[in-house]
């Protein structure tokens, strides 16, 4: 455990606290006494999300600038494989015409993968540095284990769904889709509106909560192993779970990307 003075419950609770900023006073929030207000943001989630997004841009830009027509290096080959895989997925699932979808899918896949990958760092490494070197009261390093991050990304996808629906069908067509399906009669407009509204709103909610739930559970298992077992025996469970978690990390990034493509493809269909 990170501290001999902590009980397992204290240790687990400490690692589930975000570093928060109170926007009313622009001061850090005490995790032991959080204010009952909406005006707080998880600045650790924002920081790592932005840093990992910039890392993605820098890595891919550097590879693009150094790309050659000859024999590529190992890193360039890996990047090209990822790009080819994402591009193939877009061609298979998106049947409209848009230059935005493939770059969007690539960004989502790599960005979510990098955020998920933070879960494989030693559970106490960055929080220990933050507490003892920087004097921060709390730190969580997995942005995708924060429901605010995953729902914010899902909200961005939802806005694109609305944009493509209105762009391809027009305001009138989009309105008819909400009010005259599945029952094509004016008397069923209220029922149709409820059914289609729930169906539409469930897309971003399920998209965000699915990623959050899987990553939060994975993070919690690492914390439980570190908090409840002696340090010399943690590797017995940590190593197998970390190996299995690599699959979860990749799969969740892939699922988020695929559902985004599918939802945008459905929105782009002309009726």
From Swiss-Prot:
Biological process according to GO: proton motive force-driven plasma membrane ATP synthesis
Coiled-coil features, chain-numbered ranges: none
InterPro entries for the chain: ATP_syn_F0_a_bact/chloroplast, ATP_synth_F0_asu, ATP_synth_F0_asu_AS, F0_ATP_A_sf
Membrane-topology descriptor: Multi-pass membrane protein
Keywords annotated in UniProt: ATP synthesis, Cell inner membrane, Cell membrane, CF(0), Hydrogen ion transport, Ion transport, Membrane, Transmembrane, Transmembrane helix, Transport
Segments in the Cytoplasmic topological domain: 61-99, 167-219, 263-271
Effect annotated for changing residue 214 to H: Completely defective
Subcellular compartments: Cell inner membrane
Topology Periplasmic: residue spans: 1-39, 121-145, 241
GO cellular component: plasma membrane; proton-transporting ATP synthase complex
Membrane-spanning ranges: 40-60, 100-120, 146-166, 220-240, 242-262
Key word Ion transport present: yes
Any Pfam family: ATP-synt_A
MF terms in GO: proton-transporting ATP synthase activity, rotational mechanism
Summary of subunit composition and partner proteins: F-type ATPases have 2 components, CF(1) - the catalytic core - and CF(0) - the membrane proton channel. CF(1) has five subunits: alpha(3), beta(3), gamma(1), delta(1), epsilon(1). CF(0) has three main subunits: a(1), b(2) and c(9-12). The alpha and beta chains form an alternating ring which encloses part of the gamma chain. CF(1) is attached to CF(0) by a central stalk formed by the gamma and epsilon chains, while a peripheral stalk is formed by the delta and b chains.
Family the UniProt entry places it in: Belongs to the ATPase A chain family.
Protein purpose: Key component of the proton channel; it plays a direct role in the translocation of protons across the membrane.
Name of the protein in question: ATP synthase subunit a
Organism expressing this protein natively: Escherichia coli (strain K12)
């Amino acid at each position: 455990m990170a501290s001999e003075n902590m009980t397992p419950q204290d240790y687990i609770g400490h690692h589930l606290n975000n570093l928060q900023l109170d926007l009313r006073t622009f001061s850090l929030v005490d995790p032991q006494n959080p204010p009952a207000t909406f005006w707080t943001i998880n600045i650790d989630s924002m920081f790592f999300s932005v840093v990992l997004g910039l890392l993605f841009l820098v890595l891919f830009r550097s590879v693009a600038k150094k790309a050659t027509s000859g024999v590529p290096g190992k890193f360039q080959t890996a990047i090209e494989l990822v790009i080819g895989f994402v591009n193939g997925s877009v061609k298979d699932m998106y049947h409209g015409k848009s230059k935005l979808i493939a770059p969007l899918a690539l960004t989502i896949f790599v960005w979510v993968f990098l955020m998920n990958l933070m879960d494989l760092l030693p559970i106490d490494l960055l929080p220990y540095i933050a507490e003892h070197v920087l004097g921060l009261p709390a730190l969580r390093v997995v942005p995708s284990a924060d429901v605010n991050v995953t729902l914010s990304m899902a909200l961005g996808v939802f806005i694109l769904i609305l944009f493509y629906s209105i762009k391809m069908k027009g305001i009138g067509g989009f309105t008819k889709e909400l009010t005259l399906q599945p029952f094509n009669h004016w008397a069923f407009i209220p029922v149709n509106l409820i059914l289609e509204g729930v169906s539409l709103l469930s897309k971003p909610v399920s998209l965000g909560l699915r990623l959050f739930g899987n990553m939060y559970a994975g993070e919690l298992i690492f914390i439980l192993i570190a908090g409840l077992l002696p340090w010399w025996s943690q590797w017995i469970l940590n190593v197998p779970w970390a190996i299995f978690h690599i699959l979860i990390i990749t799969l969740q990034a892939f699922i988020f990307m695929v559902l985004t493509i599918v939802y945008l493809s459905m929105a782009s269909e002309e009726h």
